């Protein structure tokens, strides 16, 4: 009897699991588009967001979609709702009289589950210009900084890390002295095991005080690559140890913001230049090709490094941070870390006045480095980025006079599609001499 019961239970389980297998797609699906396929408009043109929504493949009917819209990263000025009929709703989101972006937030509910999304559209984006000034002594300032840091021996320490090796790539932990009082950076050097001469690739990190891991895929594609951390903390520490460090140092973008000569990013920018100096000193370097790539803060440091180091031959920044950082003081979206956005961010300036902070940031803003770029670049971002505003990113791209390939994926936010990432790598390889 017990065996028969077990057999029946097993049969029931197999039958029901076949009947109720996991769905291969969502019951409610929706697609967002705009009446201009590239989401670009001229100033003064009205824009419309089109929502198409289905439940089990059947167009939704008589469901309200609620929406708000306004200028990018500004208080959303208009809100309303519209009925989805025959699976579609057309949402008017207004226009702009000045170049920039507008944002629409929308949401709707089906069977108690809420669905929400964001869409941004651009207006005369090729005409967006930075608002932060470029100091007259900008280049002189950085020439002095680099002259001083290069007078300090790098005293490089290289430690083989075979536990990270792949069949074709060897990995080493590198420590580079890049400032006074032993100020250092750490990074992971990944080199093809096959003997030969190779292009070098520098990959600065995104924002935060966090653990980094070796990156092997660039070396597997024929680069000698170095990915670094910028704070001088040994990356072999645990995630828990880095969480504690982040609690202490996480607000570093504001450290010493009152003075450009002591601002935290001075050593960071100089450290990136020294990292490229180190890569160019390697005997396996082909002597010709020096590439830089990164995203967010890494995108910013990519542009800074390419502007400051004469041996860089191409760059591929994604959604650069630290760009047009005083935008909010001019009534438009600024770049990460969103200085001056509101009273809270202004109160977090480590005691610096707005005037002092703006003066300091003018020496560190990426748009001013972008004006100095002389080599080809691959620039990519998505309109829906809520970390690094599209307005600030376009102010950077429009400041570059050197040859540039611009790849925009409007639906992406503060991330990129794998295919775009691969496109950037292949593009860099095309620049090899």
Language-model segments: which ranges?
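Proline/serine/threonine-rich low-complexity linkers at boundaries of modular beta-sandwich domains
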Residues: 19-30
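N-terminal cap/lid segment of alpha/beta-hydrolase-fold proteins
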Residues: 35-39, 149-195
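Surface-exposed, short loops/turns at beta-strand junctions within beta-sandwich domains
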Residues: 94-100
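Cap/lid segment of the alpha/beta-hydrolase catalytic domain
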Residues: 210-270, 327-330, 334
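Gly/Ser-rich "nucleophile elbow"/oxyanion-hole loop immediately N-terminal to the catalytic nucleophile
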Residues: 251-295
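Hydrolase active-site cap/lid region
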Residues: 299, 303-350, 408, 416-419
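Short beta-strand/loop motif that positions the catalytic acidic residue
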Residues: 373, 379-381
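C-terminal catalytic histidine-bearing segment of alpha/beta-hydrolase fold enzymes
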Residues: 387-433
